[in-house]
Amino acid sequence: NNIIGSNIANIGLVLSVISISTLIVIEKSFYKKDWPIMFIFTMMLFVFSLDSIISQLDGLVMFACLLVFIYYFISRNQQKNLDNEIDEKLLESSGYKITLWLLISTVSLFYGAEFLVDGAVDFAKKMNVSEAVISVSIVAIGTSIPELAASLIAIIKKEKGLSVGNIIGSNIFNIGSVLGITALILSLIHI
């Protein structure tokens, strides 16, 4: 439920805030490639959830489709010269510093997610509301905050395409990776 709510929050909240903040010019490739891929993943989730269960096979298909998408995306963009697009500060950073920040970010993300889930469960119990409702609403909005922050920073840095790409990529990864891998591990997920 959190994944569904997060994807809705990404489109409804994050994209709305971005649209209010600035004029977004979208390239043709977005309509021809990126948007249809997100739509395919969303429809795949819809079809797989018609029986209210995401099985291991469903998870395998979603994750395999994600791997195909990643391969397609990398091979499509490999031809572009990305050297000019790399931030100068990143080029000057040492591998040690990047690894340290990645480790700190990963640990912070893990514990932040733990606090978010524990807090949401406690809140649901105290308010006498189902955990599913809290998952689709409060937790989903909470998990969309990083996308909102990244999109706003992209707008400030004049990278408007990145702000929309961030949302599309997040929605695709929520379905293909988070839900796909979870279904592979847990066998059955009830939606």
PLM-predicted stretches and their roles:
Residues N1-I189:
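Hydrophobic alpha-helical segments, chiefly the membrane-spanning helices
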